[in-house]
């Protein structure tokens, strides 16, 4: 408005970083054919670069470089970021159950069995969430990823495992050097190489889910 600027929630900042991850993937490609350029990779890898970049939306130095209080001009206080980080995984169990439900429903709708009652299938699979099914809402009619992203919604979770694992290199090594490798091994090839090969080339090892498990706040250590 004329009296107040447009402000971003932190979740919207995360989304900005996420989409910028796709932009980098698309603009820095050096694939020899357009068919395999940029984000033209396997559907269950395409979200890995974008979700990896979301980690920077939680980095104190990055946030301090551009966040400002609309009245005082002060950057985001470290104490506030610390509290945000502590609260990051509140409700994460519900979030991931919801994601698993959406992915399962997407795969079921686009599976080999003929579907004549979309509500019935949505109701049956809703047990995954442990919540009561909201009758007469027909939420699937507004589930945009069912169209154009068909049978690929599971790729968000699958890609997050890769994205979290790739970020571990940035945490452990000089981010400038790692960034060069990231550009060379992940962004430049596009779909001209198998995603699994790209990940191994970048990490120097087979990927695993340890970083993902830690990122979502699970403790799977044995007593």
Language-model regions, residue ranges each:
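C-terminal, non-catalytic "cap/extension" segments appended to globular domains
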Residues: 16-19, 23-32, 38-47, 52-59, ...
